[in-house]
């Protein structure tokens, strides 16, 4: 495993050198063998637990990164990696660098009094969700390993501790730029923006202010595409703070996330999102808002005069809504296999969504049924039969293939994950987890054990998600 240092060149106080804290009895619980092979991570089995617990990393100059964040709209100027250590980066087969980070590896200078640890349940949840999202075709951070610490993490209630090994194409967040902007560190901002462009947007060849305007536009494009992909499968992030918004356009932080069952744009599962700020249907607005916060941070790189900088960036920010509407309409067209375009399509889609909400139909299973109905494989829900007569006139012989690629047959449902975690906690068995991950590996295909994980819960009104911190 060849680790390459990064981030230290950005600013003096951006990446603080720190080392993981040793744990009592590391035990490898989950290992992502295909991911390890993709990155040529050749750690022998007997050393994996000690390596990815942090116990073998004492000689490596790991770092904790600083960042700020708007958390539920309230600004915190100093957050940072309070329980994570960035070891460096590894190269994939395309020679692209990916950060490798330990999460739950002990307190850092950014811990703000926290213990720096992670409980086992949230660690397993991150493993399941990140790999499920990858299989669903959604840009995401990845999970290489989960290592039990052999120690108790004092949450409510006390739980076994664990360390997650996370891979990401970078950990550069909107909050990373806010952190340097708050300090007035223009040189650091430029270094960070140039690093982000180098890693994620190398096609940007412009110089001067145009370079950073192009960067902002590229981030917006990726955020639009990311949120549309979330909504295609019913994913609700739950904590879309600016510190959880990567400029790469990858999904990060699966703590309070959930999947929508019955369709409703107002769906919220997070226990702390009392106002529905991060509801399913509000995710585009929040992504737009977060991009505006990035733009504010980039002002010194665009023009010395704030008003002129804002004038240059405002049209780019305002373009988010139009881009989203185009991509969102295209998403519904693929989910319904609509042939060509028709002025009545908007009304057709709106009618379907109203029926889904009114009859509390399951989002995933309804679109699966519509897809399979084109080949006679499944019947359409009775309440949709009249609507389906109009829809079928808009399909053609290519519709099934288009719909099958857009509509998963299985998703990481909330109650399924809870069942997996419950079984693991009670018996220590990962059999159900591996069985589910095998099915989830091909979520758009019909596999042997698919039906076991397809059923929607009778109700999830009392289901709440929590941050694992």
From Swiss-Prot:
Protein keywords? ATP-binding, Magnesium, Manganese, Metal-binding, Nucleotide-binding, Nucleotidyltransferase, Transferase
- Looking at the UniProt entry, the stretches that span the membrane are none
Instruction: Supply the EC number(s).
Output: 2.7.7.-, 2.7.7.108
Name the catalytic site residues: 243
Q: Which InterPro entries match?
A: SelO (IPR003846)
Q: Where does Mg(2+) bind?
A: 244, 253
Residues of the signal peptide: none
Q: Where does ATP bind?
A: 80, 82-83, 103, 115-116, 166, 173, 253
Spell out the NCBIfam families in the cross-references: PRK00029.1
Instruction: Describe its function.
Output: Nucleotidyltransferase involved in the post-translational modification of proteins. It can catalyze the addition of adenosine monophosphate (AMP) or uridine monophosphate (UMP) to a protein, resulting in modifications known as AMPylation and UMPylation.
Q: What is this protein called?
A: Protein nucleotidyltransferase YdiU
Q: Which organism is it from?
A: Pseudoalteromonas translucida (strain TAC 125)
Biological classification of the source: Bacteria, Pseudomonadati, Pseudomonadota, Gammaproteobacteria, Alteromonadales
